[in-house]
Amino acid sequence: MTKGADIIAAIILLALAIAIIVYLLHWLYRRSSKEVSFVRTGMLGEKVVISGGAFVLPIIHNITQVGMRTLSLTIKRGGDKSLITKDRMRAELVTEFFTKVPPDPRAVSTAAQTLGNRTLDPEHLREVVQGRFADALGEVAAKMTLDEIQENRGQFVKEVTKIADESIGHTGLALETVSIISLDQAPIEQFNPA
């Protein structure tokens, strides 16, 4: 009878040990998804996880999540912030910039370092890149007349995309495309006679 009890006790202990190991693996192993990658830092250096997973020990490691989805950021330039064109006209412009972190370890690492968790929320990301996008719009608008912008929207978008993509490339982001939603001449009240 002792031998049977010993076997049952061994089976129970083995099952308990397996349950504890499975629980620890579930708790310590972090997986990335198609929408969210992460960068693990701490012991053994940096590890970028784009598809797959890694062990994360809470005391020794820190993780920074990086959103991999394409985010749409609307930039409005109107009123006293309207663009000034080559012919000194004021243009009110609404554009959408589509940006994301490319699935490249270097880009994910850079985005984690420069942007942190802001890549997960369009509003927080807008705070970081809005000025860069507005500068690109202003720079290209200053080289073209209002009529040229209207007639050559494709060229305007191409130049804005080039300048904006270079500007945000240092943050780990890549610009997919720019879309002009609306383009109008600003009301005459917005003109400064001086």
Where are these regions (language model features)?
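N-terminal hydrophobic membrane-entry segments
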Residues: 1-194
